[in-house]
Amino acid sequence: MFSYSSSISRGVVDCTPELFYQVVRSEKVGKICAEIADAHELKMRGEMSREDFETFKSEHKKRLPVFLFHASFPNGRRISADAVPSGLSIFDLDHISTLPIPLLRTSEKSEGGDAGGHDSLENVLKALKERGCIGKSFSNLPYLFSPSSPIALIHISPSCEGLRFVFRLPEGMSLSDGQKWFAGQLGINDYDVCVKDYARCSFAVPEDYILYVNEEKLFSAPSSSLQPPP
C-alpha cells in the first residue's frame, strides 16, 4: 500500500485503485499538466527561456496532487520515521529531449495493450530502447517484460522531459540498492541517486501520460518472492 496527498503540504491517506484513477482522470490534473506542456512547447520553439520554463513548471507542479509510492503513513503525516514501506521504488529518466509527448498515442498503440488504452510493457520498453532512452545493448530486456518483471508503472513526467518508472523491489533491497539494481536492468549509468527517501513525493499526471500500468504489482502488498534475475 502506498499513500496519496492532495498537495505536498497536506496530510496523506492510503491510495486505493479507485482513488488513483480518480486523481489521474481529474480535470485539475489534466489542466495543470496541459499548461506545463504548452509552456514546454514554447521553450522548444525558443519562445520561452529555460529559466522561465523552470519557474513556470515549478509553480504549477506545486498545485498537483502527489503519490507517495515508497510507503504508506498510518499516522497521516508525510514523515519518513512513520513510513511503512510499500515494497515499491521509483526511478527517473530525466531530460529526454527526443521524447514525444505522449510517447505512444492511444491510436498508434499495438495489440497487447489494456482496456484503458495503456500499451503492453513489451511495446513500451522496445519503443524506449529504439529511441535511445534506455540502454541499447544489455541482456535483461526480455526479463523486464516477462511475467516476472518488477515494473508496475511507467509515466511521462509533468515536465514533459522525462519518464518515471515505479517498480517492485527484490527481497531485501533498500531503496538506494534498488535504484542501482534497476539502473543496471535498463542499461543506464547516470541516474538520480537521491531517490532514497520514503517520504518522497511523485506528482500526479493525467492518465494519457501513463504508458504502462500493472495494477496487481502497483497495489499488491510487498512480496518476498521477487528475486533479481540471474
Where are these regions (language model features)?
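Catalytic "initiation/cleavage/transfer" segments centered on a nucleophilic residue
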Residues: 171-172, 186-226
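A structural signal for short, well-ordered beta-strand segments and their strand-loop junctions
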Residues: 155-156, 166, 195, 203
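A common structural junction motif
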Residues: 133-136, 183-191
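Alpha-helical scaffold elements adjacent to nucleotide-binding pockets in ATP/GTP-utilizing enzyme cores
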Residues: 177-182
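Acidic, low-complexity intrinsically disordered tails
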Residues: 229-230
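Signature for HUH/AEP ssDNA processing cores
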Residues: 1-107, 111-161, 168-176
